[in-house]
Amino acid sequence: MSDGTAVRLEPHEVALLGEGPRAAVTVAVVDLHLRGLVEADLPGTIRARVVDAVEAVGAVQPPSPLAAAVHGCLRVPAAPKALVKDPGIRLAVAVMRIPLAEAGLLRYPLLGATRAARRHVRDLRHEHPLPASRHGLTDHERLLLVALHGEAALRLLVPRFALRAGLVRRAEVGRAALLKDSRRGTNGGGGAFLSCGGGGGGGGGE
Protein backbone atom coordinates (compact mmCIF):
# COMPACT_ATOMS: atom_id res chain seq x y z
CA MET A 1 0.00 0.00 0.00
CA SER A 2 1.41 3.40 -0.97
CA ASP A 3 1.14 6.66 0.94
CA GLY A 4 -1.22 7.93 -1.77
CA THR A 5 0.76 11.06 -2.61
CA ALA A 6 1.22 10.00 -6.24
CA VAL A 7 -2.52 9.47 -6.82
CA ARG A 8 -4.24 12.05 -9.02
CA LEU A 9 -7.32 13.10 -7.11
CA GLU A 10 -10.50 14.58 -8.50
CA PRO A 11 -12.01 17.60 -6.67
CA HIS A 12 -14.78 15.58 -5.01
CA GLU A 13 -12.15 13.13 -3.71
CA VAL A 14 -10.07 16.00 -2.32
CA ALA A 15 -13.20 17.29 -0.58
CA LEU A 16 -13.93 13.88 0.92
CA LEU A 17 -10.40 13.59 2.31
CA GLY A 18 -10.37 17.15 3.59
CA GLU A 19 -13.81 17.66 5.10
CA GLY A 20 -15.84 14.49 4.63
CA PRO A 21 -18.91 13.28 2.67
CA ARG A 22 -20.93 16.49 2.85
CA ALA A 23 -18.07 18.48 1.32
CA ALA A 24 -17.75 15.90 -1.46
CA VAL A 25 -21.48 16.17 -2.18
CA THR A 26 -21.19 19.97 -2.27
CA VAL A 27 -18.48 19.70 -4.93
CA ALA A 28 -20.71 17.32 -6.90
CA VAL A 29 -23.60 19.82 -6.71
CA VAL A 30 -21.38 22.65 -7.97
CA ASP A 31 -20.11 20.38 -10.76
CA LEU A 32 -23.70 19.77 -11.86
CA HIS A 33 -24.47 23.49 -11.63
CA LEU A 34 -21.49 24.40 -13.82
CA ARG A 35 -22.71 21.84 -16.36
CA GLY A 36 -26.17 23.42 -16.33
CA LEU A 37 -27.75 20.24 -14.96
CA VAL A 38 -29.15 21.60 -11.69
CA GLU A 39 -30.52 24.91 -10.46
CA ALA A 40 -31.70 26.51 -7.25
CA ASP A 41 -35.39 25.91 -6.59
CA LEU A 42 -37.30 27.11 -3.54
CA PRO A 43 -35.01 28.95 -1.11
CA GLY A 44 -32.46 26.52 0.27
CA THR A 45 -33.19 23.70 -2.20
CA ILE A 46 -31.83 22.40 -5.50
CA ARG A 47 -33.47 20.50 -8.34
CA ALA A 48 -32.41 18.93 -11.62
CA ARG A 49 -32.95 20.95 -14.78
CA VAL A 50 -34.65 19.60 -17.86
CA VAL A 51 -31.79 19.37 -20.35
CA ASP A 52 -32.46 19.15 -24.08
CA ALA A 53 -30.59 16.85 -26.45
CA VAL A 54 -28.29 19.60 -27.73
CA GLU A 55 -27.11 20.45 -24.22
CA ALA A 56 -26.61 16.78 -23.38
CA VAL A 57 -24.46 16.18 -26.46
CA GLY A 58 -22.43 19.30 -25.67
CA ALA A 59 -21.09 17.85 -22.42
CA VAL A 60 -17.33 17.33 -22.65
CA GLN A 61 -17.30 14.34 -20.31
CA PRO A 62 -19.86 12.64 -18.11
CA PRO A 63 -20.10 13.66 -14.46
CA SER A 64 -18.50 11.54 -11.76
CA PRO A 65 -20.52 8.63 -10.34
CA LEU A 66 -21.10 10.72 -7.21
CA ALA A 67 -22.40 13.67 -9.25
CA ALA A 68 -24.59 11.28 -11.25
CA ALA A 69 -26.07 9.93 -8.01
CA VAL A 70 -26.71 13.47 -6.77
CA HIS A 71 -28.37 14.37 -10.08
CA GLY A 72 -30.65 11.35 -9.84
CA CYS A 73 -31.68 12.37 -6.33
CA LEU A 74 -32.53 15.90 -7.46
CA ARG A 75 -35.41 14.92 -9.72
CA VAL A 76 -37.30 16.09 -6.64
CA PRO A 77 -36.10 19.35 -5.02
CA ALA A 78 -33.95 18.73 -1.96
CA ALA A 79 -31.92 20.70 0.56
CA PRO A 80 -28.14 20.19 0.38
CA LYS A 81 -27.92 18.81 3.92
CA ALA A 82 -30.48 16.13 3.02
CA LEU A 83 -28.51 14.85 0.04
CA VAL A 84 -25.77 13.22 2.07
CA LYS A 85 -28.42 11.06 3.79
CA ASP A 86 -29.86 9.69 0.53
CA PRO A 87 -29.16 5.93 0.19
CA GLY A 88 -28.01 6.22 -3.43
CA ILE A 89 -25.60 9.03 -2.61
CA ARG A 90 -24.31 7.21 0.48
CA LEU A 91 -23.60 4.21 -1.74
CA ALA A 92 -21.74 6.40 -4.24
CA VAL A 93 -19.61 7.84 -1.42
CA ALA A 94 -18.87 4.33 -0.13
CA VAL A 95 -17.75 3.22 -3.60
CA MET A 96 -15.62 6.37 -3.85
CA ARG A 97 -13.79 5.40 -0.70
CA ILE A 98 -12.58 2.02 -1.99
CA PRO A 99 -9.77 3.21 -4.32
CA LEU A 100 -8.80 5.92 -1.84
CA ALA A 101 -8.38 3.30 0.89
CA GLU A 102 -6.43 1.06 -1.49
CA ALA A 103 -4.13 4.02 -2.24
CA GLY A 104 -3.43 4.50 1.46
CA LEU A 105 -5.41 7.72 1.76
CA LEU A 106 -8.12 6.28 4.02
CA ARG A 107 -7.43 3.97 6.92
CA TYR A 108 -9.41 0.88 7.82
CA PRO A 109 -11.82 0.16 9.40
CA LEU A 110 -13.32 3.62 10.03
CA LEU A 111 -12.06 5.06 6.72
CA GLY A 112 -10.81 8.34 8.15
CA ALA A 113 -8.18 10.27 6.21
CA THR A 114 -4.61 9.12 6.82
CA ARG A 115 -1.82 11.46 7.85
CA ALA A 116 -0.49 11.37 4.28
CA ALA A 117 -3.92 12.33 2.93
CA ARG A 118 -4.28 15.25 5.34
CA ARG A 119 -0.80 16.45 4.46
CA HIS A 120 -1.60 16.21 0.75
CA VAL A 121 -4.77 18.28 1.18
CA ARG A 122 -2.85 20.90 3.16
CA ASP A 123 -0.24 21.08 0.42
CA LEU A 124 -2.95 21.54 -2.20
CA ARG A 125 -4.46 24.42 -0.19
CA HIS A 126 -1.09 26.17 -0.18
CA GLU A 127 -0.60 25.52 -3.91
CA HIS A 128 -4.11 26.70 -4.82
CA PRO A 129 -5.04 29.75 -2.71
CA LEU A 130 -8.29 31.59 -3.34
CA PRO A 131 -7.81 34.00 -6.26
CA ALA A 132 -8.81 37.65 -6.15
CA SER A 133 -11.42 37.07 -8.88
CA ARG A 134 -13.47 34.18 -10.21
CA HIS A 135 -12.85 35.19 -13.82
CA GLY A 136 -10.54 33.19 -16.08
CA LEU A 137 -10.84 29.91 -14.18
CA THR A 138 -11.69 26.56 -15.72
CA ASP A 139 -14.52 24.52 -14.24
CA HIS A 140 -12.00 22.03 -12.86
CA GLU A 141 -10.12 24.84 -11.13
CA ARG A 142 -13.37 26.13 -9.64
CA LEU A 143 -14.27 22.69 -8.32
CA LEU A 144 -10.82 22.19 -6.81
CA LEU A 145 -11.04 25.56 -5.06
CA VAL A 146 -14.46 24.64 -3.64
CA ALA A 147 -13.01 21.32 -2.44
CA LEU A 148 -10.09 23.07 -0.75
CA HIS A 149 -11.65 26.26 0.59
CA GLY A 150 -15.30 25.39 1.13
CA GLU A 151 -17.72 28.23 1.86
CA ALA A 152 -15.21 30.98 1.08
CA ALA A 153 -14.78 29.55 -2.43
CA LEU A 154 -18.54 29.16 -2.90
CA ARG A 155 -19.11 32.81 -2.02
CA LEU A 156 -16.43 33.89 -4.49
CA LEU A 157 -17.05 31.53 -7.40
CA VAL A 158 -20.81 30.79 -7.47
CA PRO A 159 -22.29 33.34 -5.04
CA ARG A 160 -25.87 33.55 -6.30
CA PHE A 161 -26.33 29.83 -6.78
CA ALA A 162 -24.65 28.97 -3.47
CA LEU A 163 -26.83 31.41 -1.56
CA ARG A 164 -30.14 30.47 -3.20
CA ALA A 165 -29.40 26.75 -3.05
CA GLY A 166 -28.52 26.80 0.64
CA LEU A 167 -24.87 25.83 0.16
CA VAL A 168 -23.74 28.81 2.26
CA ARG A 169 -25.24 30.45 5.29
CA ARG A 170 -27.12 33.66 4.79
CA ALA A 171 -25.58 36.69 6.53
CA GLU A 172 -28.03 39.39 7.52
CA VAL A 173 -28.29 42.27 9.94
CA GLY A 174 -30.38 41.25 12.93
CA ARG A 175 -32.33 44.44 13.62
CA ALA A 176 -34.57 42.75 16.18
CA ALA A 177 -31.54 41.36 17.97
CA LEU A 178 -29.95 44.80 18.04
CA LEU A 179 -33.06 46.34 19.56
CA LYS A 180 -33.24 43.56 22.12
CA ASP A 181 -29.60 44.12 23.09
CA SER A 182 -30.21 47.87 23.23
CA ARG A 183 -33.02 47.40 25.75
CA ARG A 184 -30.67 45.30 27.85
CA GLY A 185 -28.13 48.11 27.82
CA THR A 186 -25.50 46.22 25.85
CA ASN A 187 -23.12 48.05 23.59
CA GLY A 188 -22.45 45.57 20.77
CA GLY A 189 -20.35 46.62 17.84
CA GLY A 190 -21.59 44.77 14.77
CA GLY A 191 -24.96 43.11 15.23
CA ALA A 192 -24.50 40.85 12.19
CA PHE A 193 -25.36 37.20 12.61
CA LEU A 194 -25.66 34.07 10.52
CA SER A 195 -28.98 32.51 9.66
CA CYS A 196 -30.18 29.85 7.27
CA GLY A 197 -33.23 31.90 6.28
CA GLY A 198 -34.22 35.45 5.51
CA GLY A 199 -32.83 38.15 3.29
CA GLY A 200 -29.38 39.10 2.15
CA GLY A 201 -27.86 39.49 -1.25
CA GLY A 202 -25.79 36.97 -3.11
CA GLY A 203 -22.86 38.94 -4.46
CA GLY A 204 -21.99 39.35 -8.08
CA GLY A 205 -23.12 37.46 -11.13
CA GLU A 206 -21.89 34.01 -11.94
Give the residues covered by each predicted segment.
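Acidic, Ser/Thr/Pro-rich intrinsically disordered cytosolic tails and loops
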Residues: 1-206
